[in-house]
Amino acid sequence: MNEEQRYRLRTPASGRFFEEARRHLPGGDSRSTLFYPPWPAVLDRGEGCRVWDLDGNRLLDFTGNHSILVHGYRHPAVTDAIHRQLDRGTCFPGPTEAQLALARHLVGRIASLELVRFTNSGTEAVMMALRAARRYTGRRLVAKLEGGFHGTAEDVMGSVHPDLVLLPAGDAEAAAGMLDRRREDIAALLVEPVQGSAGMIPLDAGFLHAMRDATRRLGIVLVFDEVVSLRVSHGGAQEHYGIRPDMTCLGKLIGGGLPLGAFGGRREIMALFDPSHGAPAIPHPGSYNANPVSLASGLATLELLTREAVAGLNRMGDRLRAELRRVFDEAGVSVAITGLGSLFGIHLTDRAVRTVRDAVESDAAMRHRIFLGLYNEGILLDPRGVGTLSTAIGEREVEQLLDALRRVLAQLGSPAAAGNA
């Protein structure tokens, strides 16, 4: 019996749910990245670092809902903050104390944020940051790096758009040259310091510093998309790399499991949104902007994510990446392990992975078999081979992941498994 057959036997309720959901939702869901064959498991509840599916299978979760839940599921301090705000109201037609509290925290925590505004997602944060860069510079084009994912806005989602200039990640000379040639047209360079969707690939520090130098020289607004990478240091990847961008976009974990995004940066750029002296240069309406329940959840989450907590996560991440390499090496499976801090990526390739171009060589079929095999062993990873740690995960849980991976690789390497592939 192969991995998929075992998965089908373990998740029949999810299979039935999926067939019913497809009658009402295209693909059975509203989030494309969650699909994998034969059907995605339907998760029913979570507690700490564990989730349960509809069939009652208990799994150790190494996704944190794709890096959002940095403290795991239902952390008491976070749920208490949510309940307190719910008792006061879910939304209001005016500013709230919750908004000021989280704004004050973020401005004090992240060096590049002189002023900040809130949105409902990282996608919206990127959209507003780019709108500001265009208005501030009077230019239209946006440059981004190969492999960077910045949400689902039309002009940055793909790699081909009339307003988009695509730069090679990792090649500082070529990227700077392309910026220089279009210097009169490029408003912003959008950078994901750790490229999450590409496979948790941290960009080279020298390359990032070169991009900071080039954008400063050319008058291009440097925008760091820290939706995923905020967790790698107390002040985000920008603190880790020692780079101060002009603007920063946030999302995912800053809502503590509820929808929230934020963007901010230099005072003179953010002043374009200020309506207190007349009509703002850039309007920023939104009925759910700065929702107080999300803000309360986010503040509780970030207050728990102290420097000490981040350091502990990063130490565990360093150890996990080293041990993952060891397990694959012992099994004779070629692998490149990427990541930074509490983020990790597994690439089934015999070449070093420094950019997305290296990552495309990964064996996708083998990766899927490992994913299903780990699910059958009670371990939940992202089907794309990436994962994150949470403060709810300890050394014992890391060992459980490593032991499960050893069993899966041993099964995949057996003659019977090869015949059932």
Feature locations, PLM:
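Conserved N-terminal phosphate-binding loop of PLP-dependent enzymes in the Aspartate aminotransferase
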Residues: M1-A421
